[in-house]
From Swiss-Prot:
Family as reported in the entry's similarity comment: Belongs to the YciB family.
Described purpose of this protein according to its UniProt entry: Plays a role in cell envelope biogenesis, maintenance of cell envelope integrity and membrane homeostasis.
Gene that this polypeptide is encoded by: yciB
InterPro entries: YciB
Record carries keyword Cell inner membrane: yes
Transmembrane segments: 3-23, 54-74, 81-101, 119-139, 149-169
UniProt xrefs under Pfam families: IspA
NCBIfam families the record matches: ispZ, PRK00259.1-3
CC annotations in GO: plasma membrane
Subcellular localization: Cell inner membrane
Protein name, UniProt field: Inner membrane-spanning protein YciB
Keyword Cytoplasm included in the entry's annotation: no
Source organism of the structure: Legionella pneumophila (strain Paris)
Keyword entries, A-Z: Cell inner membrane, Cell membrane, Membrane, Transmembrane, Transmembrane helix
């Protein structure tokens, strides 16, 4: 259910774009992101950092898209999120005691420090590639193709990456790791 909630703004953006165009879809995505953050705060009594991060980016780039009537700002949003995520993941390997991926997953899985750092680097590289791929699609194809890629390509590649990662992790864990769940 949380996964569907996380994709709420992008799914609304996609649907509204198909009927009303990029500017209305951008405005709806901005409102949906704000609603998402407020709802999460009311329901769980705290903010989800990723929601706040995404909200800040969509408000700035979505606002610029609407103000300048230029869709290129919103087309840069996924790349901004991907590349800032890459920077955070990469930096976490040097700042603090553990890489970010370990902080996120260590209660569910037991890995060596070396594997945690490899996994963190893999996510860093994934985010860099996804940001570049978003720009490639945005600059080489029309907006219709980019909107489809934003939803289906972004989600599809992420699920594929998680699946590949799961296979990789099975080689580096034992059954006791999964008993914690």
């Amino acid at each position: 259910m949380k996964l569907l909630f996380d994709f709420f703004p992008i799914v609304l953006f996609f649907i509204v774009y198909k009927f009303f165009g990029i500017y209305t879809a951008t405005a709806v995505a901005m409102v949906a992101s704000l609603t998402q953050v407020a709802f999460y705060r009311l329901k769980f009594q705290h903010y989800e950092k990723m929601h706040l991060f995404s909200l800040a980016i969509i408000m700035v780039l979505g606002g610029a898209t609407l103000f300048f009537q230029n869709p290129w700002f919103i087309k840069w949003k996924p790349t901004g999120i991907y590349w800032l995520s890459a920077l955070v993941f990469y930096g976490s390997g040097y700042i603090g005691s553990k890489p970010l991926i370990q902080k996120m997953m260590e209660t569910n899985i037991n890995l060596t420090t070396k594997i945690w750092y490899r996994l963190n680097l893999a996510w860093t590289l994934f985010f860099i590639v996804m940001g570049a791929l978003n720009l490639y699609v945005a600059y080489h194809y029309d907006t219709d193709v980019w909107v489809n890629f934003k939803l289906f390509g972004g989600v599809g590649f992420t699920l594929l990456f998680v699946l590949i990662q799961a296979f990789y992790l099975t080689k580096h864990t034992d059954e006791k790791s999964f008993e914690k769940q």
